[in-house]
């Protein structure tokens, strides 16, 4: 599949405007195709991100740190691949290092890399956890995503406040309930 040109993308926006009954040549919509293409370039910039490269800078002097590292409430906005409507939420990531750690900003960067794509929350949860597991090789990883989906609030069942939670565990988090319990207790929204 070849990537359409910028002009072809702008023409597609004009077509959608006509589809909903709008006139793409009216004053307020003249620059809309260009704005939408610019927005999509930013919103979907995760396709160009290499997660392995993001997690490449590791620190090995951890002073024998053996408990888990938790970064909570990483905010994100993504777009569901089914309706192309936003879902907005937070990600909590914990890992128990084996022999290395990464700077905490790297965890937020991988959330951005995966959220700035067409997504489903379940897949994004697994992608984040498995990428940390694969690249850092920790004893285990836990990821929890909580999100509001506008495909449920703007259309269909019209549920404004329904929050979807997904979790994925690897290693010791998957094997031992105590670690899952501690993670869920620390990430519970109060």
From Swiss-Prot:
E.C. number, please? 3.5.4.16
InterPro entries per the record?
A: GTP-CH-I_C/QueF, GTP-CH-I_N, GTP_CycHdrlase_I, GTP_CycHdrlase_I_CS, GTP_CycHdrlase_I_dom
Pathway assigned in UniProt? Cofactor biosynthesis; 7,8-dihydroneopterin triphosphate biosynthesis; 7,8-dihydroneopterin triphosphate from GTP: step 1/1
State a single Pfam family of this protein.
GTP_cyclohydroI
Q: Which SUPFAM superfamilies match?
A: Tetrahydrobiopterin biosynthesis enzymes-like
Q: State the source organism's domain of life.
A: Bacteria
User: For this protein, what reaction is catalysed?
Assistant: GTP + H2O = 7,8-dihydroneopterin 3'-triphosphate + formate + H(+)
> What residues bind Zn(2+), as annotated?
80, 83, 151
Question: What Gene3D superfamilies does the record point to?
Answer: 1.10.286.10, 3.30.1130.10
Q: Which family does it belong to?
A: Belongs to the GTP cyclohydrolase I family.
Quaternary structure and interacting proteins, as annotated: Toroid-shaped homodecamer, composed of two pentamers of five dimers.
- What is the protein name for this chain? GTP cyclohydrolase 1
């Amino acid at each position: 599949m070849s990537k359409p040109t910028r002009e072809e993308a702008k023409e597609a926006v004009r077509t959608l405007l006509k589809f909903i009954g709008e006139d793409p040549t009216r004053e307020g919509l003249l620059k809309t195709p260009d704005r939408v293409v610019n927005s999509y370039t930013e919103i979907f910039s995760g396709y160009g991100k290499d997660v392995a490269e993001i997690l490449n800078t590791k620190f090995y002097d951890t002073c024998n740190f053996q408990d888990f590292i938790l970064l909570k409430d990483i905010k994100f906005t993504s777009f569901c691949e089914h309706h192309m409507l936003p879902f907005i939420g937070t990600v909590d990531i914990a890992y128990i290092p084996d022999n290395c750690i990464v700077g905490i900003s790297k965890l937020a960067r991988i959330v951005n890399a995966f959220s700035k794509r067409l997504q489903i929350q379940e897949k994004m949860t697994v992608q984040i956890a498995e990428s940390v597991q694969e690249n850092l090789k920790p004893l285990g990883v836990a990821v929890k995503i909580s999100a509001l989906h506008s495909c449920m609030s703007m259309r269909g069942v019209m549920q404004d406040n329904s929050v979807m939670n997904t979790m994925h565990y690897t290693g010791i988090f998957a094997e031992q309930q105590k670690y899952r319990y501690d993670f869920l207790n620390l990430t519970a929204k109060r």
